[in-house]
Amino acid sequence: MAIGLVGRKVGMTRIFTEDGTSIPVTVIEATPNRVTQLRTEESDGYRALQVTAGTKKANRINKAEAGHFAKAGVEAGRTLVEFRLEENEGADIEVGSEITVEIFNDTKKIDVTGTSKGKGFQGAIKRWNFSSQRMTHGNSLSHRAPGSIGQNQSPGKVFKGKKMAGQLGNKQVTTQSLEVVRVDVENGLILVKGAVPGATGNDVIVKPAVKA
């Protein structure tokens, strides 16, 4: 897994190419990520890089977190994220150093992970894209009902995983192979073509695309 960044979804806008083509983009603010820990094969059984981003009020930090950040010599952040490292990756990175959007200067496509917008309890039509039943012609009660959910006495149960009504959204989602339109190192911004998961202001994890 490649090294990535923790950013924040600012919102969507559009930019124009030289020939006047409009490109919809999502703006991701990725302030410098501070390295809080380096996990090693010897002590942890795997190699990884742990970073934090943003800030957090001192009265919102417990003693364990405060000690962890103090040991790394960095300001307390709002989240902790790990990126797995390959065998020879991250050799020049030290605890307390910073990682900026510069790492994406030569990257053409990225994967963005975030928490999708929560929609609450939704029916099978909205949640699973089921077709609705007839609005008339004898149907007076089951317009948006899912239909049959099983068989008869055999097997005599509803199988696990059956698509039914329930909680929609508020899940971790990764959108893959999004095109990087622009990287603004000075302002710590990444402009990505298209939409990314989550609401405006949510944290997102940006990594080089796996399927690039």
UniProtKB/Swiss-Prot annotation:
- What cellular component GO annotations does this protein have? cytosolic large ribosomal subunit
Question: What stretch or stretches form a coiled coil here?
Answer: none
PROSITE patterns, alphabetized: RIBOSOMAL_L3
User: Sites of the modification N5-methylglutamine?
Assistant: 153
Give the Gene Ontology MF terms in alphabetical order. rRNA binding; structural constituent of ribosome
Is ATP-binding tagged as a keyword?
no
Cytoplasm recorded as keyword: no
- Domain of life of the source: Bacteria
Among InterPro entries, the record links this protein to: Ribosomal_uL3, Ribosomal_uL3_bac/org-type, Ribosomal_uL3_CS, Transl_B-barrel_sf
PTM entry text: Methylated by PrmB.
User: Which GO BP terms, alphabetically?
Assistant: translation
UniProt xrefs under Pfam families = Ribosomal_L3
Region annotated Disordered, chain positions: 135-161
Keywords assigned by UniProt, alphabetized:
Methylation, Ribonucleoprotein, Ribosomal protein, RNA-binding, rRNA-binding
Q: What does this protein do?
A: One of the primary rRNA binding proteins, it binds directly near the 3'-end of the 23S rRNA, where it nucleates assembly of the 50S subunit.
UniProt-listed NCBIfam families: L3_bact (TIGR03625)
Q: How does it assemble?
A: Part of the 50S ribosomal subunit. Forms a cluster with proteins L14 and L19.
The family note in this entry says: Belongs to the universal ribosomal protein uL3 family.
Which PANTHER family does this entry report, sorted A to Z? 50S RIBOSOMAL PROTEIN L3 (PTHR11229), LARGE RIBOSOMAL SUBUNIT PROTEIN UL3C (PTHR11229:SF16)
Q: Return the protein name.
A: Large ribosomal subunit protein uL3
Q: Which organism is it from?
A: Alteromonas mediterranea (strain DSM 17117 / CIP 110805 / LMG 28347 / Deep ecotype)
